[in-house]
Amino acid sequence: MKVAIAICRNIWYSEALSEMNTQILVSILGLAILAALSSGAKAAEPELAVEVSELLKAMEHAPQPQERECRWFWGACKSDSDCCRYLGCKRKWPNICLWSPWG
């Protein structure tokens, strides 16, 4: 163990390698900081998902899929009236709602 420490000390203090060693040390410390920050963010991620889902459930006027009066972009349709404003029903197969200059 003492030999390994002595070798590391000799490499670290050599003048030719001191600048490179500093850069390597800074890089390793930077990666360690990024790893710590990302692990903290991953730990908080499930809490955020729960909070967002609770907020959506608490909204009284949350949009529900069955309340839609029109079909959105790429939705299946039979006529232009099925599609939302500025969308028109494509005349050929597949019949889907697309952007329409006349809609």
Swiss-Prot record:
Q: What's any one GO cellular component for it?
A: extracellular region
A Pfam family recorded for this sequence? Toxin_12
Disulfide bridge partners, by residue number? 70-84, 77-89, 83-97
Q: Which UniProt keywords apply?
A: Disulfide bond, Ion channel impairing toxin, Knottin, Secreted, Signal, Toxin
**Signal sequence residues:** 1-43
Query: Its principal location?
Result: secreted
GO molecular function terms attached to this record: ion channel inhibitor activity; toxin activity
Q: Which InterPro entries match?
A: Huwentoxin-1 (IPR011696)
Instruction: Please give the tissue specificity annotation from the record for this chain.
Output: Expressed by the venom gland.
Q: Which residues form the propeptide?
A: 44-68
* Keyword hit for Coiled coil: no
What is its subcellular localisation? Secreted
Which SUPFAM superfamilies does the protein's record reference? omega toxin-like
The role this protein plays is: Probable ion channel inhibitor.
Q: Family membership, please give it.
A: Belongs to the neurotoxin 10 (Hwtx-1) family. 45 (Jztx-60) subfamily.
Q: What is known of its domains?
A: The presence of a 'disulfide through disulfide knot' structurally defines this protein as a knottin.
**What name does the UniProt record give this protein?**
U28-theraphotoxin-Cg1a
